[in-house]
Amino acid sequence: SHVACGHVGNAATVYPLQHMGHEVWPVHTVLLSHHPGHGGWHGAHISAGDVTAVLKGLKVHGVLERCAAILTGYLGAVAVGKAVLSGWNDVRAANPNAIVACDPILGDDAEGLYVPDALIAFYLDHAIPAADVIFPNRFELALLSGHDVRDITSAVVAARAIMARGPSTVIATSVPVGHELATVLVSTIGCWAVVTPRLTTPVKGAGDVFAALWVGYVLGDANTAAVALGRAVSDVHGLLERAADEALKELPLYKYSPASAVPRFAPAPLKL
């Protein structure tokens, strides 16, 4: 997805990845004025046919073998999801080592479900089994796993239920820990959590930036998924702190580049 004002979707992910030294080929699924959560938005959804055409163009251009990772976010419709899934298959055919990372955007605790119900089944039956990594928030983790997610322990149980469908790694955000929040990584080799203070800010897109940073670190010099977890959480928390301090309505990506500044908060992932 893409917005003209603010930093969500590709407007949140492209710049951090480029700043980390990665070439990025954004494929938009919507073009909006700003995040709908702020109200009064205008724009349009990109058709499944147009998404397919862009992905086909990349294939014809002969660049897919250079694709080291795919990061999928907002789909909005099952037809678009099917077009994206076809793109995943083309990338994997060109580069079997490419990482497929999927942020299963369905909703959140504040707004509930904000996509068509049919997308839940699409993720469960098609996208999640085909992905290597997924990035659900607490609401999405509970919805997709069928488990009540109320703390780190229950998040791990829910993540393992989702992993039984195929992905090797689940990274859950916004998991409650008393008055704090945890980001929990569950993989086939272990579980880790990073706990951060809860901040009050209206900004959108923190999850999008986090997913991009984690993928960027894994493709870069982070030697483990857990190291990438700690770095990505630290960077995003720093952005949210600055947004809260300055009473901003959008993430200040233009002002404070993640993955570059010395973090105010540098938590070490806790091995569970």
Which stretches of residues belong to each language-model region?
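Conserved N-terminal subdomain of the carbohydrate kinase-like
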Residues: 1-109, 255-272
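Glycine-rich beta-alpha junction loops
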Residues: 3, 30-32, 76, 106-108, ...
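Short acidic, glycine/serine/threonine-rich loops at helix termini
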Residues: 9-11, 38, 111-114, 181-185, ...
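Residue-level signal for inorganic ion chemistry
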Residues: 70, 137, 207
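Conserved phosphate/ATP/ADP-binding segment of small-molecule kinases
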Residues: 113-192, 199-201, 221-226
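Short glycine/threonine-rich catalytic loop with a Thr-x-Gly-x-Asp
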Residues: 196-214, 228
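Short glycine/serine- and small hydrophobic-enriched flexible loop segments
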Residues: 212-220, 234, 238
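Charged C-terminal helix
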Residues: 226-272
